[in-house]
Amino acid sequence: MGFLKGKKGLIVGVANNKSIAYGIAQSCFNQGATLAFTYLNESLEKRVRPIAQELNSPYVYELDVSKEEHFKSLYNSVKKDLGSLDFIVHSVAFAPKEALEGSLLETSKSAFNTAMEISVYSLIELTNTLKPLLNNGASVLTLSYLGSTKYMAHYNVMGLAKAALESAVRYLAVDLGKHHIRVNALSAGPIRTLASSGIADFRMILKWNEINAPLRKNVSLEEVGNAGMYLLSSLSSGVSGEVHFVDAGYHVMGMGAVEEKDNKATLLWDLHKEQ
């Protein structure tokens, strides 16, 4: 028996079969969930519909989170097709490319507002819109990153947005807890996705994480997907307001990993460069 058998969930923000939202959707489907999906525009619809078909879902809706009328339409469509929901996955984040270059000091007010509206307020509006459809014990999950609390090169205004997103998770967890609805964030390590492709030097970031994480590896899409499924299922029924890390332990590190060489501690990163 699957952990999500008979449960219905909405996946918001899947971009392709490399995205974290896809990994979560696949794991939920494997555990018996019925899924619905959203797409941003016609261009992304062509990517999302094959994913929905792969996961046996006829439910695909347009949702541009910057358009209020789309939320109303989404509510009506989900209510008509599914009646209610047991979980929501919010995988929406955006900042203009120029805001991920240079320094935070150079961030324009327009870029700042865009990042906050799309990456943070969308979770609040989505949850509030669909709250009447959420069943007792439902779960809401959003995606964050370590750049919310630590400096990450080239992350800039998205670090601020993720910090605000994690704060929103805590406040929403309290607001919705009285209705027995849980809200959590999943903070994954670096993975090659459409979103990460916009971050400069991402290949170096992947290698740095692999060398310095306690598990000496990068996480897989399957590992992140399974963790997401856990947070959406009754397996985590006592968990809310949490930021759950799936990053091979990288978030616990205070400095680069070291190893003994010639009777002295040497950075693994330096040893790797010598090879």
From Swiss-Prot:
Which residues of the sequence carry a binding annotation for NAD(+)?
13, 19-20, 64-65, 92, 162, 191-195
- The UniProt record gives the binding positions of substrate as 95
Annotated keywords: Fatty acid biosynthesis, Fatty acid metabolism, Lipid biosynthesis, Lipid metabolism, NAD, Oxidoreductase
Q: What is its EC number?
A: 1.3.1.9
Q: What class of enzyme is it?
A: oxidoreductase
| Disulfide pairings | none
Which residue positions hold the site described Involved in acyl-ACP binding? 203
Q: Does the keyword Transcription regulation apply?
A: no
Q: Biological process GO annotation list?
A: fatty acid elongation
* Catalytic-site annotation from UniProt: 145 (proton acceptor), 155 (proton acceptor)
Q: Would you say which domain of life the source belongs to?
A: Bacteria
Reaction catalysed by this chain? a 2,3-saturated acyl-[ACP] + NAD(+) = a (2E)-enoyl-[ACP] + NADH + H(+)
Pathway membership: Lipid metabolism; fatty acid biosynthesis
- What is a single molecular function from GO for this protein? identical protein binding
Q: How does it assemble?
A: Homotetramer.
Functional description taken from the UniProt entry: Catalyzes the reduction of a carbon-carbon double bond in an enoyl moiety that is covalently linked to an acyl carrier protein (ACP). Involved in the elongation cycle of fatty acid which are used in the lipid metabolism.
Q: Which family does it belong to?
A: Belongs to the short-chain dehydrogenases/reductases (SDR) family. FabI subfamily.
Report the NCBIfam families cross-referenced here.
PRK08415.1 (NF006266)
Q: What is the protein name given in its UniProt record?
A: Enoyl-[acyl-carrier-protein] reductase [NADH] FabI
Q: What is the lineage of its organism?
A: Bacteria, Pseudomonadati, Campylobacterota, Epsilonproteobacteria, Campylobacterales
